[in-house]
Amino acid sequence: MSISLRCAAALLLTGILLNGCGNSEGSADIRVLNVSIDYSTVDLYLDNGTTNTPTITGTTYGTLTPYKGVSGGAYTVEFTNNGVQSSLKSLSENLAARTSKTYVSYGDIGGFGFLEILENQDPPDSGYTMVQIIDAAPDAGSVDVYLTDPAATLADSSPTFSGVAGGVVGSGFLTITDGTYRLRVTGAGNQSDIRLDSVTGTSFSNQEILSIVLGGTRGGVLVNATVIPQQGTATPITNPYARVRAVAGIPSGSNLSASLSGSTLLTSAAANTVSSYSLVQAGTAQLNLTLNNGALTPTSQTLNPGWDYTILVLNGSSVAGTTTTLLADDNRLPTSSTYAKISLVNAMSSLGDPVTLNVNYTPEANAVALGNSSATSQVTAGTADTEIDTVDATTSTTLFSNIQATLTGNGVYDLFMFGSAAAPVAALHINRQQ
């Protein structure tokens, strides 16, 4: 058996359209695939030095447009937000007549980019397929890509593409036997760090030339994929999983167990415990909790594919009974390695007041209510020289202060505040570091 993919798993990158095959006599044919979550609708302009023309407009997230034929020549290719003329990013290049290209737009706010796929490759010999990886998911960090027999285990497999970096067309084409392949993506060098699994496999046809585009997700760690045959119709592979962890905001001396759709998150965990993330099937999931050896009524949680979540369980003097809150986590990386990201989670179940987070005397999260988390803030990274303080937003009382905290570059952190005003507990938790 060999290596391939195309009709894979679930489709969340909805609306991937058909695209007529190129190309018109004397023209260059271009199209756009948009995999940017933050820039969910984009326009492509072509500037020939005389006029700046909106050429492909209104490309929504997950959509591959039909080809647009343009006169061959030198252009500035420019992307903008839909309906806005200010440039997100531009590139000067020559669009040669009788050639075809797909532009892939991607990125977060402040980190927009686009890559291009050249679609005039000669086909491989009969019985083979050519495959390349286009990594438009820089937030995922460096990844390994496996194309295997659908039944093969990762432990018995080697990466087809190793250490693929985000934001580059870096893999080059690999010629493989045609057939059905299971696509799996892991963190580089770590087979247990699953980022995508197409499970059943995708068919790679005889003499096909395929580009597999990896796209980012809302959580930042998992990825989606889109398989694009040269000058053909795209097939999306939507991640079937979410990543979920649980947090025990319970009184000292208590213990909590938590499972979600059969995945164990906590086992007799002490107060103030933060579990690791686990992969859980997206959709409706049943949450089962046991507090101090007593089972609580199960609840249903709705998980979006590709998202990261925290299930915050609270029990204490400021809470009526036991509450659970599903918090969406933003674990996308900072814009550069000189920065870190941080958010505040208010789990002070025996206080009840909102809490404010200051980093180097600057408020980064204001009056976060009990049972909630703040938006993620980007701050300057530092080693043993960052001051982090939390304050009771009602009384202005300092709850926690660390004048020698370390926030590592490219790290994503949560500061969990537990306990009461008399006995506050702070836990600075690193969610990921690239």
Please provide the spans of the model-predicted regions.
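Sec-dependent bacterial lipoprotein signal peptides
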Residues: 1-19
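Intrinsically disordered, low-complexity polar regions and short flexible loop motifs
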Residues: 21-434
